[in-house]
Amino acid sequence: MNYSKRFRVVPGSKVDLSKVDAGFKDKHETHQDALGVIETHNRKLHDLQYLMYAEGKRSLLIVLQGRDAAGKDGTINHVLGAMNPQGCSVTGFKVPSKEEAAHDFLWRYHHHTPGKGQVAIF
């Protein structure tokens, strides 16, 4: 499967989350299968992060959504463990503060979006 086409949001396009399958599972049904795939691709992730940083033109925002204890922290640790932590940031968002609630919905996210060559995980 070509994941870059399935999950990529093209700049300027409109996203309809009701059309996204939130229960998507790939052929790797077991935890052990998934860990094997992660290990296989860790070096490539590391190399691609370095190239993106060196190019300095693009950034990557990864949005993980799930309830408490859904495995978001484990996903970050396993999948992004090969990346250079100096080029990554992880931000969790809880209930908006009074200041955040006084602004538009996306105001609190803008400050945490990644700069060129950087990776951010929400």
What are these regions (language model features)?
Residues 1-122:
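Glycine-rich phosphate-binding loop of ATP-dependent small-molecule kinases
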